[in-house]
Amino acid sequence: MEAQSHSSTTTEKKKVENSIVKCSTRTDVSEKAVASSTTSNEDESPGQTYHRERRNAITMQPQNVQGLSKVSEEPSTSSDERASLIKKEIHGSLPHVAEPSVPYRGTVFAMDPRNGYMEPHYHPPHLFPAFHPPVPIDARHHEGRYHYDPSPIPPLHMTSALSSSPTYPDLPFIRISPHRNPAAASESPFSPPHPYINPYMDYIRSLHSSPSLSMISATRGLSPTDAPHAGVSPAEYYHQMALLTGQRSPYADIIPSAATAGTGAIHMEYLHAMDSTRFPSPRLSARPSRKRTLSISPLSDHSFDLQTMIRTSPNSLVTILNNSRSSSSASGSYGHLSASAISPALSFTYSSAPVSLHMHQQILSRQQSLGSAFGHSPPLIHPAPTFPTQRPIPGIPTVLNPVQVSSGPSESSQNKPTSESAVSSTGDPMHNKRSKIKPDEDLPSPGARGQQEQPEGTTLVKEEGDKDESKQEPEVIYETNCHWEGCAREFDTQEQLVHHINNDHIHGEKKEFVCRWLDCSREQKPFKAQYMLVVHMRRHTGEKPHKCTFEGCTKAYSRLENLKTHLRSHTGEKPYVCEHEGCNKAFSNASDRAKHQNRTHSNEKPYVCKIPGCTKRYTDPSSLRKHVKTVHGPEAHVTKKQRGDIHPRPPPPRDSGSHSQSRSPGRPTQGALGEQQDLSNTTSKREECLQVKTVKAEKPMTSQPSPGGQSSCSSQQSPISNYSNSGLELPLTDGGSIGDLSAIDETPIMDSTISTATTALALQARRNPAGTKWMEHVKLERLKQVNGMFPRLNPILPPKAPAVSPLIGNGTQSNNTCSLGGPMTLLPGRSDLSGVDVTMLNMLNRRDSSASTISSAYLSSRRSSGISPCFSSRRSSEASQAEGRPQNVSVADSYDPISTDASRRSSEASQSDGLPSLLSLTPAQQYRLKAKYAAATGGPPPTPLPNMERMSLKTRLALLGDALEPGVALPPVHAPRRCSDGGAHGYGRRHLQPHDAPGHGVRRASDPVRTGSEGLALPRVPRFSSLSSCNPPAMATSAEKRSLVLQNYTRPEGGQSRNFHSSPCPPSITENVTLESLTMDADANLNDEDFLPDDVVQYLNSQNQAGYEQHFPSTLPDDSKVPHGPGDFDAPGLPDSHAGQQFHALEQPCPEGSKTDLPIQWNEVSSGSADLSSSKLKCGPRPAVPQTRAFGFCNGMVVHPQNPLRSGPAGGYQTLGENSNPYGGPEHLMLHNSPGSGTSGNAFHEQPCKAPQYGNCLNRQPVAPGALDGACGAGIQASKLKSTPMQGSGGQLNFGLPVAPNESAGSMVNGMQNQDPVGQGYLAHQLLGDSMQHPGAGRPGQQMLGQISATSHINIYQGPESCLPGAHGMGSQPSSLAVVRGYQPCASFGGSRRQAMPRDSLALQSGQLSDTSQTCRVNGIKMEMKGQPHPLCSNLQNYSGQFYDQTVGFSQQDTKAGSFSISDASCLLQGTSAKNSELLSPGANQVTSTVDSLDSHDLEGVQIDFDAIIDDGDHSSLMSGALSPSIIQNLSYSSSRLTTPRASLPFPALSMSTTNMAIGDMSSLLTSLAEESKFLAVMQ
């Protein structure tokens, strides 16, 4: 070896001398030396053997001497004597040690690195300089060139043993001034054998701790004062550093000699200790868990002057790069060189041992650069965490290929796994790779492609707007003629053409960014931004404005990212490290890494040629592109068509890290062309396929294998990350508004904080089996990994589930669409969506990020809130008010400050998008989802809901997914809905919520409570006067109403006629027709459970069940007693049939024991469980709050039961009606004011709420159990009631309609319609709907849809404030959502669009409660929905004063059929009596996790009505904080924070007993907290 090394040394010496001497001046020499290492100066001295990039220096260094012979390895100029001396000392360990006299590389000249002169012209600095002056910088530095001494450190010739020793490669060697005695190189200048114990170490320490010390200068030898020792020139200093192992320098003891290296017996413990304890410098630690590898590209370096570097590029990288992470390990570097310990110019030509030294140098440069960036890089050696048995560094070839040895900048060096490639640009290769899993790894994970362009031009050119434009640079084109459509101008130069196009065509058509170039493959598909078009045009003109600024390099690129990739060839940066365990190879671009990984570590060929008939598959995207280009023609490459417009391809199969190996077999086929898969492209979103990228495109998180793979905060790779694409891919229509989300090049769509799992899922917009499979596959894989991390999703989507129909720009829904957010609409049919889908969609809902809720891929960031493991996003509030979120937010979540599922500002859910997000899902639903998910994935079962033991069997079964009514889950998606339609549930139109009313803007829960505005409120009517005095405008016939409702004609802006329930936008004619027919045909069965917050459902169920069953039978008059005929009850102008129904309940005597009095703790409320026992609810005195809510919500429309029962713990509540008639009195049932009804007949008796009216008296009116029952029971056949106008003013609603499930006539709806063609349009049937079926869940025969068992007249108070709190909810129907669930049933009365009416009520409402005269459609949902019982849930959801569209909650069936059995009605909620009855919201002290009563159906059928969501705006912004504002509003007049529903309706004051709402109740909070903890545990 020695002989060889000597010979090589001689040869190299000659070569080096030649190369250096070629320069005319010393300065040139120094410059050239520098340039040779830093910039390739092939142009000036093509003959030089080493043109290399900073890191390529390593690549240039062959492993063996023979290889070196070709490389100019500067022999040490030191005399052989010296070398021999050293050899003796080190026992021959360093055969080629250069003489100390020429400290640097043994070039013939010992040049001073500072001035290029042969002799150091600066006096050596003091032995221990107080500080190192800054590195002198001259213009050349600004020019991007460093001028290092060409005669730097002599090559560190180490024995092969040393080279193979893992210690070297693993140790980041740090140069420290040896302070050696110049006279005796062999002797340690310090007497102590272990200098680290000595002042010297103190000095070192000072270096570490002293930022003032310019480590950059120290590392580079740039600073004249850096010479560490008086007798030592900087060159010597570095030389000695290099020789530390051989000399008795302070580190001689630490650094293993050849012998020790050979044995590998080096004790690094000391170093470790030193490293970790003494030198807390910022250098990279061995810890593999750092952030992802950051490109150390100078471009990414904040200290790098891009503008100077890219002098010629019109589009300087500065703006981009300055903003890029400056934390790259090279952050301290001046230019493309990181402030590495040894200047690249000092490139060592190493002999056989060089590999280790290379590693050493690179490590130094990497780590030190890291430290030096801070101005104080630890000079100490950084021990490798472990030293494997001696073995060559894995990534480094033992011998360099000639190509590699040859000119450095050659890009081949990049592509080849050169020795240097082993070293990642940042950090130890070993650690680097492990610690920084770049999502952009080889596979084109979204961020990756952008960076990893192939230097050649094959680099992926990610077209911001379209992946079509593969990243590869276009063929050399020099177009001078304009081929723009209609333009044939010719120019002399390309520049002129470009100018013409930009000014005349692009800027001239500012409104539309379309390429009209003839034969453009984009086919005039518009770009989302002008800059995209500008970049795109370069494909046609051949313009390549981005030129490489390194001297001698003539490369130019049309895309900046390609230039950046290319620059890596000069800088040697290789940010893409092989993710295979034990492989340290690093690559400058992801494609090369992909190639390496797929070829070396697997046989996978994920990149499949998409050209029809071609079956070629490749290991990397660049090969695929090359194939496509050469075989199929330049135009064939990666076009969207290839990618398959049919449905977005799943992200390239390649997933980072270990996943890369684990890719599912199916993935490869799915892998798109590298380019296509270019998911890695930051902007790689195709126009059509919106990829919501969750991570910074530029540099995906290290930890996350793929951008979507892991949240930045998670060190684990997200299970979903396998799909690098990680993001939603939603097909957008051409101009899809959402496409913009990720359209911007280099603009990460989502924060790295995105949930780990979140990103990976991509919904396949197009319904495509492949997509579905992909989704299934992804989910399965992810689920396996993620069990417990987030709510369990069904791993396998229903066949169509993943399909998201193309997003429609305007947001209209085609087919069955769920509007996802903004303009996008998901079109999956009801059958398509499964709980999983819903969950996913909900999660999509999560974040408001860029343009729509869609932005978060599929789960909200887990970071979002400590307690909301999966849902809320950090920016929870943004979304929260964003879209018309009337929907199903689980009240509990919304207002439970500690809700388990949501953070207090439960991300959007709080105000809730219409999507039934998990937040929206009731606890039961969530529970069920989890259970299903666990079952599917084999994970542990979810934590049982707190009240499970109390739940009815049915509820339990439902939770377990054995729902009795599997079909009754979500409204059929196919039920047509227009944006104009309100009502998430069943897609019925939603009631206007106060905030929906004109003039009501979005309002945060924190905003002061606003009472319903006049506009929303029904026209004021004297409270105590009879209804007839109100003289509301006559209602249109039911048919008319229906049509009007559909058309929203019923909702004139002004006055009384405003139909609050109608959706804000008038439906189109076609919509009317279609909706009408579809709604009538809709067969989805909805349970209240589906929409009402779990808590509410539970509460309602419990109420209904107990009260209903207990009292209903007893209190309900026999059918004979109760008028079944439509004529039985007339509720003149009864705004809400609902009221009537509920009134019954009010009237029903409530058992003394009922909890009606119980204050609804806010927690309870939040849980959705006012813990009234079902019986209590059923009991007459229904908690006013809920009832009131139900009733009172109607803005000012208070339906006061004429005779609210005072019986029961009425004391606490005000009886809704002053006169309480037994439930049985049909007359009371009759809402009509007829004097006979026991209250002043027509007068709207505002049953004086005993409690102060909160606008709406929240007075908890005792609700007659029967009434409640009725309400629930009346799952109203409201469907039939549907648009039946209640008899208008004076018209008496006949609630008595028997609710025979199938009785159309009997159905309240029909009856209502029939009876009161003109009726107020108040859906008496709403009342009915709620109460109609009160006859008992089990008693279909008794179901009286419209039948309000209670005879009490419900006085509908039109005064906006008069909404009886209980009137609605309290109303006679125990099971009425209004009463039970919908605390807001009244809401339906109220103008608020979202009425919390029971779904049944909804039916009623939709029947048309016009505020005044107009039919107020609850949610505008046609109650017609096929006899699906609408769970009251949706209505109830509106606890807070928010009215939900959900009022529409009627099961469409219910409403339509109106025939659903009472049991259905009763159960409407979630099988109200059965499922949820036991799910009472936990008692005051019990908090039901919102997840608690997740109804399996609810999830399953959950259709997310995106339109509604969008439409509604922030209807239901439940208080993000705690209780649903509505509920609380009146609970605590003063506590607006809790009660500030956006649409805060006045609530009747609660009686003290109820007002005891434990809004601040600690026990409730604690309970809630405990539940949350449980929930989180489950989630995790």
From Swiss-Prot:
It comes from the Eukaryota. PROSITE patterns: ZINC_FINGER_C2H2_1, ZINC_FINGER_C2H2_2. One of its GO terms (cellular component) is nucleus. Keywords: Acetylation, Activator, Cell projection, Cilium, Cytoplasm, DNA-binding, Isopeptide bond, Metal-binding, Methylation, Nucleus, Phosphoprotein, Repeat, Repressor, Transcription, Transcription regulation, Ubl conjugation, Zinc, Zinc-finger. One of its GO terms (molecular function) is RNA polymerase II cis-regulatory region sequence-specific DNA binding. A zinc finger (C2H2-type) spans 480-505, 513-540, 546-570, 576-601, 607-632. Residues 1-79, 368-475, 620-728, 863-918, 981-1042 are annotated as: Disordered. SMART domains: ZnF_C2H2 (SM00355). The modification N-acetylmethionine is found at residue 1. The modification Omega-N-methylarginine is found at residue 175. There is a cross-link at residues 438, 462, 779 (Glycyl lysine isopeptide (Lys-Gly) (interchain with G-Cter in SUMO2)). The full-length GLI3 form (GLI3FL) interacts with SUFU and this interaction regulates the formation of either repressor or activator forms of GLI3. Its association with SUFU is regulated by Hh signaling and dissociation of the SUFU-GLI3 interaction requires the presence of the ciliary motor KIF3A. Interacts with KIF7. The activator form of GLI3 (GLI3A) but not the repressor form (GLI3R) can interact with TRPS1. The phosphorylated form interacts with BTRC. Interacts with ZIC1. Interacts with ZIC3 (via C2H2-type domains 3, 4 and 5); the interaction enhances its transcriptional activity. It is found in: Nucleus; Cytoplasm; Cell projection, Cilium. There is a cross-link at residues 773, 779, 784, 800 (Glycyl lysine isopeptide (Lys-Gly) (interchain with G-Cter in ubiquitin)). Residues 1-10, 58-78, 401-427, 908-918 have a biased composition (Polar residues). The lineage of its organism: Eukaryota, Metazoa, Chordata, Craniata, Vertebrata. Residues 703-726, 863-882 have a biased composition (Low complexity). Residues 461-474, 632-648, 684-699 have a biased composition (Basic and acidic residues). Belongs to the GLI C2H2-type zinc-finger protein family. Its main location: nucleus. This is Transcriptional activator GLI3. Phosphorylated on multiple sites by protein kinase A (PKA) and phosphorylation by PKA primes further phosphorylation by CK1 and GSK3. Phosphorylated by DYRK2 (in vitro). Phosphorylation is essential for its proteolytic processing. One of its GO terms (biological process) is smoothened signaling pathway. Residues 745-845 are annotated as: Mediates interaction with DZIP1.
